[in-house]
From Swiss-Prot:
Keywords: DNA damage, DNA recombination, DNA repair, Metal-binding, Zinc, Zinc-finger. Belongs to the RecR family. HAMAP family: RecR. It comes from Bartonella quintana (strain Toulouse) (Rochalimaea quintana). CDD domains: TOPRIM_recR (cd01025). May play a role in DNA repair. It seems to be involved in an RecBC-independent recombinational process of DNA repair. It may act with RecF and RecO. PANTHER family: RECOMBINATION PROTEIN RECR. PROSITE patterns: RECR, TOPRIM. This is Recombination protein RecR. GO terms for biological process: DNA recombination; DNA repair. The gene is recR. Gene3D superfamilies: 3.40.1360.10, 6.10.250.240, RecR Domain 1. Transmembrane segments: none annotated.
Amino acid sequence: MSKHIAGPEIERLIQLLARIPGFGPRSARRAALYLIKKKETLLEPLGAAIQAAVDKVCICSVCGNVDTTDPCSICRDPRRDDTTIIVVEDVADLWALERARTLAARYHVLGGRLSPLDGIGPDELNITSLVQRVVQNPIMEIILAVNATVEGQTTAHYITDQLSNFSVKITRLAHGVPVGGELDYLDDGTLAAALQARTNL
């Protein structure tokens, strides 16, 4: 008896879906079957959307955001406060803060957090480009909106040290972000409160 229940194309779809965070082999099979059942209304539009993303999505060369233009729509928005940069670990955190609609500032995506055990040091993150933005622009405040984890706090302290010779105010998110919590899982009200009550480092 063959160990493959379906054809190679369907098996490949299941294997790729299983790589998505939150999906396992069983949930990937269920998702694949659902997509196949909804071929015209979901599978085909999803395939077209994925192909469009492959063709058009890029990383913003200024802040590290994901968009279909470079610079991204946030960096091109003239209504943003050019003197304030919110530093986040990942694009998911940027999107979470944007949903809170509290501060119309600029962003800087680090692309992760310092984690020596995982081999992630300063050279693997977008820290040098952050320093360059401070050098080249009249930045007055850096808001460190990193996750309240050991690695996140280590990253915050490292960035603070790197910017210690500049006359820039450095703040971090205050109450509302639980220790060990990650921004993408917080509700909009909690994020808004944390931004409003940020504190100096």
